[in-house]
Amino acid sequence: MREPESGTIERWAWDYVSATSLDAKLAPPPVPTRWEEAPPLRRLEAPGRPPELRIVQKAAKTRGLNSEHGRARALHTFLHHELQAAELMAWAVLAYPSAPQEFRAGLVRIALDEIRHMHLYAKEISRLGHAIGDFTVRDWFWERIPSCPDPASFVAAMGLGFESANLEHTTSYAARFRDAGDEQGARVQELIGREEVAHVRFGARWFETFRGGMDFETWRTALPAPLSPLLMRGRPLHREARRRAGQPEPFLDALDAWQPDDLPGS
């Protein structure tokens, strides 16, 4: 696979995904302003991984948050989610070269937001007496997203899927951190949740552009197997945030009611 031309946005995306140092993941160089002319399709199979990150096939479950250790473990998982999201936004810049340049530029902006969120989490992990690398992580997003065949499938899974579910997860974890007496940690969750709305709105806008609408079945069938709506929602749905992010009420009703065919009572 031919590497992108130096000094281009595509090269920045390539280098970010491929980087193997923690510093390069947390503080990449400024994004160039020049796009490559007629870029080819490039699908990187896996990201570079700093030695600090210990990748496992099955992540440890987030359990009690009453201890600093438990909250640090949870935040470490969230930081790795943000890293994968940043990498996959950069990955998509390379994987969908024929997509509108406005769309690809938006992916870069979101990647930079995710990197900033990583810094927020890293600071909180340090406050709790831990560091990046103290806990194992799983590249779960990377196990799923690269199978997206086109930009519509990508935003269905990322913007309207994982990032949408984070509207619920950040709300839930903010409450749990607050219950544990960690007001600072709760506020960070709330901040990231508020900023996630724009990312979901970006996904909704471009899914409508690519597929001509935002109905539930069109979205569900765009998800790459084996992903399903079950993984793309928290309980209860944060309807107000999702509405602000461009998800209409009929979509939310269908998402709330959906269950796999093989569940009892379905």
Features from the language model and the residues they span:
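Non-heme di-metal
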Residues: 1-266
